[in-house]
Swiss-Prot record:
Site residues, Transition state stabilizer: 325
Cofactor binding note from Swiss-Prot or TrEMBL: Binds 1 Mg(2+) ion per subunit.
Protein name: Ribulose bisphosphate carboxylase large chain
rRNA-binding listed as a keyword: no
Residues where N6,N6,N6-trimethyllysine is found: 5
One GO biological process term: reductive pentose-phosphate cycle
GO molecular function: magnesium ion binding; monooxygenase activity; ribulose-bisphosphate carboxylase activity
Active site per UniProt: 166 (proton acceptor), 285 (proton acceptor)
Modified residues (N6-carboxylysine): 192
Assembly mode: Heterohexadecamer of 8 large chains and 8 small chains; disulfide-linked. The disulfide link is formed within the large subunit homodimers.
Subcellular location: Plastid, Chloroplast
Species annotation: Senna didymobotrya
Length: 455
């Protein structure tokens, strides 16, 4: 007789193990599963566990050459989603040995690489991951982290202010540098390359880097504050990206930028290592995230992409605003903002956090609020995001009727007023508009901004 039983068998016989005790070293995943009609949730959950670990669609003789029990993913719990028809949360545990150390790329290839096109599922969404300490320790994480960044910049006790230079495409390098200088001189801490500014015919990267560096040093000399501009090093190849980062370091600027989803995790991790070794801060933009995270029942939640970035490395990352033009629910956003900044985060389903996550002193990432925000939003932003954040006003700076520098002044005055009011114990949520109005009495720049963007 044959040594094994050939043929197709139900996944749930092998991969659905409700009595499994999860190990501290397991990577745990919470999937939102929508099975096809007639497929039981246990089979759907088990199929996810199988296809993203050791399973294939039929029994194979080489299964006998390994210990499936040691290497298989296990679906250990399934619960229906309240208020949704035919949606379940399937919890899957993966043994640590399935993953290459220090590779976000491999982690994602394993967990979400293949299983999302699966026939038995109508839709599938990865809601959260628990990264065990033993795996976290194989990553360097952010190049510097929040505390080191504050010490480098000598800025404490308030959020940092940024501004994306617009029009994002079409300016010459010299005019671009001019816009940067005006914003920094007016009182912003940072200006930013737009995510699609790489090296186009109207402005090559080297020219932009040179003029922006000049703008930074001039503004620093005039204001006595440390300034930065996120120089976008994203490129078509990793080698070209590194070349740009090296040039930025040679110019002596403090920070570079990368589009981590379009650039890819492998490129991002390389850049992150370079930044730590060479004292550059790394600003991360999440272009393409909505392609992955916008659908409620399919894809990946942004909190997973945020966790992955903290492992791969970045000092700032865009995290939505809770106010402005891009969507984001408050509690859920605050959930992944804390996942980025804090060392230890308790499981809390009301904030979308499915697992308790211990980052074991991996440096934190500053969340960046950006997109359609202006001076009237300042009290809300200060209250919601707190000190450890970057508030970015693109149009909210450059749209000022008097120009960039007064626009920057308006934002800085509004921020300092909010921070002062908060430190005096005033309630920003209730008195926010009043605080801004008071401040605008002694700042004509702020008064003009208040006129343009009505509360």
């Amino acid at each position: 007789s044959v040594g094994f039983k050939a043929g197709v068998k139900d996944y749930k016989l092998t991969y659905y193990t409700p009595d499994y005790e999860t190990k501290d070293t397991d990577i745990l995943a919470a999937f939102r599963v929508t099975p096809q009609p007639g497929v039981p949730p246990e089979e759907a959950g088990a199929a996810v566990a199988a296809e993203s670990s050791t399973g294939t669609w039929t029994t194979v003789w080489t299964d006998g050459l390994t210990s499936l029990d040691r290497y298989k993913g296990r679906c250990y719990h399934i619960e229906p989603v309240a208020g949704e028809e035919n949606q379940y949360i399937a919890y899957v545990a993966y043994p640590l040995d399935l993953f290459e150390e220090g590779s976000v790329t491999n982690m994602f290839t394993s967990i979400v690489g293949n299983v999302f096109g699966f026939k038995a599922l109508r839709a599938l969404r990865l809601e959260d991951l628990r990264i065990p300490t033993s795996y976290t320790k194989t990553f360097q994480g952010p190049p510097h982290g929040i505390q080191v960044e504050r010490d480098k910049l000598n800025k404490y006790g308030r959020p940092l202010l940024g501004c994306t230079i617009k029009p994002k495409l079409g300016l010459s390098a010299k005019n671009y540098g001019r816009a940067v200088y005006e914003c920094l001189r007016g009182g912003l801490d940072f200006t930013k390359d737009d995510e699609n500014v790489n090296s186009q015919p109207f402005m090559r990267w080297r020219d932009r880097f040179l003029f922006c560096a000049e703008a930074i040093f001039k503004a620093q000399a005039e204001t006595g504050e440390i300034k930065g501009h996120y120089l976008n090093a994203t490129a078509g190849t990793c080698e070209e990206m590194m070349k740009r980062a090296v040039f930025a370091r040679e110019l002596g600027v403090p920070i570079v930028m990368h589009d981590y989803l379009t650039g890819g995790f492998t490129a991002n991790t390389s850049l992150s290592h370079y930044c730590r070794d060479n004292g550059l801060l790394l600003h991360i933009h999440r272009a393409m995230h909505a392609v992955i995270d916008r659908q409620k029942n399919h894809g990946m939640h942004f909190r997973v992409l945020a966790k992955a970035l903290r492992l791969s490395g970045g000092d700032h990352i865009h995290a939505g605003t809770v106010v402005g033009k891009l969507e984001g629910e408050r509690e859920i956003t605050l959930g992944f903002v804390d996942l980025l900044r804090d060392d230890f985060i308790e499981k809390d389903r009301s904030r979308g956090i499915y697992f308790t996550q211990d980052w074991v002193s991996l440096p934190g990432v500053l969340p960046v609020a950006s997109g359609g925000i202006h001076v009237w939003h300042m009290p809300a932003l200060t209250e919601i995001f707190g000190d450890d954040s970057v508030l970015q006003f693109g149009g909210g700076t450059l749209g000022h009727p008097w120009g960039n520098a007064p626009g920057a002044v308006a934002n800085r005055v509004a921020l300092e007023a909010c921070v002062q009011a908060r430190n005096e114990g005033r309630d920003l949520a209730r008195e926010g508009n009043e605080i801004i109005r008071e401040a605008s009495k002694w700042s004509p720049e702020l008064a003009a901004a208040c006129e343009v963007w009505k509360e």
